[in-house]
Amino acid sequence: MKTILLTTVVLATFAAAHEYDFQKGWPTTPEGLKTIGDSHGEIDVDSEGNFYVSVVGGEKSGIQIYDASGKYLRNLPNARNNFHGFTMVKEDGKDVIYAACLGDKTTAFLKLSIKGEVLLEIPLSAIPAEIGTSFALTHADRAPNGDIYVIDGYASDRLFIFGADGKFKRATAGKGEPWKLNTAHKFAFDTRFEPARILVCDRTNDRLIHLDLEGNFLSVYATGILKPCTVDFHGDLVCVAQLASGISILDKEGKVLKRLGANDNPAEFNTNGVAPEKWREGITTSPHGATFDKDGNVVTTEWNSWGRLLRWNVKL
């Protein structure tokens, strides 16, 4: 019991008690490229500490893989250039990618191994026609029970739930009462709570909300978040990529403890048009994806036509 209590205290004070150092020159871009390429996606980390970042355009579009030092390793086979949101999950002890296909004419979801093997594909036609026929799917993740959740964040704001076999189960949430979602951009399963919840980035409303696993509205977790795009967890902490600049780190109660890379120039955030010559070290433009690594370091990928990654290491 004492060990559990001590761990809880350490995690709860982690961000408040430590500072973060911006890592200049991280990562090293693929050979021959000055930037990673047009980015409007996500970043996540595998169990070996390698980073996976989705890139929508350029010579190395798809998913680029970097080691912890920032060295480019390779691109992931069969990863498409429309993986707007994806999550690295563990299945039977193996790392697996769950990806939503934004703007695809036939595919809603792909499940890939980290070798690039296609393990499951869910077609758009799996969603019943009475629910809709035009979608803009922005993120996917695996529920604690193995179900697949995909969110329609650039269209209806509805959350689509499929079984592990890819068969459609139901749709939930949306723009109506009580959710009132407006650009439900991405989400994550919040296992800090029992039972687990869904933490949704309600981007246009500048807030994070909690749903139960059925999609029922529970509560507003945090407000005043500047266009939240994605969330990731490290112990009791959650980091939030904010399209209107900066990475916020919140505690379990939804209180902002730290803000990294804040930009005070409105012309340089909430846009993908800030060219490399205008980038400032340690200052974000439009963070779109973010992840913690196992040590609590923070990496973000921006919405940027040239493509940009930034990293902060926690000072212990």
Label each region the model flagged:
Residues 17-36, 272-280:
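A short helix->beta-strand "capping" segment at the edge of beta-propeller domains
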Residues 24-61, 304-307:
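Beta-strand-rich domains and repeat architectures in extracellular enzymes and scaffolds
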Residues 29-30, 59-97, 102, 126-128:
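Blade-loop segments of beta-propeller domains
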Residues 34-48, 80-93, 126-147, 177-197, ...:
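Beta-rich, blade/repeat-based domains predominating
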Residues 50-53, 96-99, 147-150, 197-200, ...:
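Conserved beta-propeller blade signature
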Residues 56-58, 102-104, 153-155, 192, ...:
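Short loop/turn segments immediately following the C-termini of beta-strands
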Residues 66-71, 113-117, 163-167, 212-216, ...:
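Short loop/turn segments that connect beta-strands within beta-propeller blades
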Residues 283-316:
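Blade-level signature of beta-propeller repeat domains, shared across WD40, Kelch, NHL, RCC1
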